[in-house]
Amino acid sequence: FIQANDMRPLADTANFIAVYPQGAIDPEGGTTSWIHKAPTDHDDIFFIEAIINELSTEYDIDQGRIYACGYSEGAIISYELGCRLNSRIAAFAAVSGSMLDDYYRDDIYGWGTCSPVHPTAMMLIPGTVDQNPHSTYEGLSYGDMPLYMSANDITTFWSSYNNTDAVPVITNVEDVSPNDGSTVERKVWLNGDNCSSVQELKVIGGDHDWPGVLGNMDIDATNEIWNFVSRFSIEGKLNCNISVNDFSFDKKQNLNSNTKDKY
């Protein structure tokens, strides 16, 4: 992940701590993929919580501004952190990876349903032609068993939980790279509890990529994510004067921050 998306230069200027964990080693086989088989007692959520606790003893971290993001399987674990470590996660983002359906999470893994405990801002950046089983735009089922949620189901879940406006504000991102074979539609659900919001950057024609590095070049996923999550704490939006323009990244804007956050 760090090879494709090195956030350290941004962390240096925006004053946050970038942490790149590797999935805990599975005692049965030695692999390090995130939550890759079920049923299992091998639970990466406990591992991430232990990392947060350990880093909190070494650094002066704002405990109200701990964020998560990930790509592919890392996106899946980001959703799980939003669901099952929600009391520690202020906001999160997922790129090219889907959210486990509650059937898969509960009946197969035995982790219970997704149960956040506070209004939680979240962003997803899916590609509409992504054919990886765990990240297809339309979701994935095996027979009558739902496994991974569609992008629409994900935004419905989080916008409903956050009690946002039912209808999103939709804008088209400028197609500054017409040769990349894709465009981006920005959908923002505003006015949630504690001024929370949900945002989808729908990459139309996008594949299993991290925009700005591979695939779509109209947006930079790294900057888009930080611009979004950094506006929230565990208690909600830092400034409740919400405008949809708040969520449109401008490369000219100042990303410097006076707080040290874990990301």
Residue ranges and their predicted role:
Residues 22, 69, 95-96, 123-127, ...:
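Alpha/beta-hydrolase-fold catalytic nucleophile elbow
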Residues 217-239:
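Catalytic active-site module of serine/aspartate enzymes centered on a nucleophile-bearing elbow/loop
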Residues 165-168, 236-262:
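Residue-level detector of functionally pivotal "anchor" positions at catalytic/ligand-binding pockets or at interdomain
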Residues 90-91, 96-182, 188-195:
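The feature captures the conserved acid-bearing segment of alpha/beta-hydrolase catalytic domains
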Residues 9-14, 60-62, 69, 73, ...:
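Extracellular/periplasmic catalytic domains that process cell-envelope and extracellular macromolecules
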Residues 1-67, 71, 80, 84, ...:
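Serine-hydrolase catalytic machinery in alpha/beta-hydrolase-like enzymes
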Residues 205-209:
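Histidine-bearing beta->alpha loop at or near hydrolase active sites
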Residues 75-86, 96:
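Short glycine-enriched nucleophile-adjacent loop
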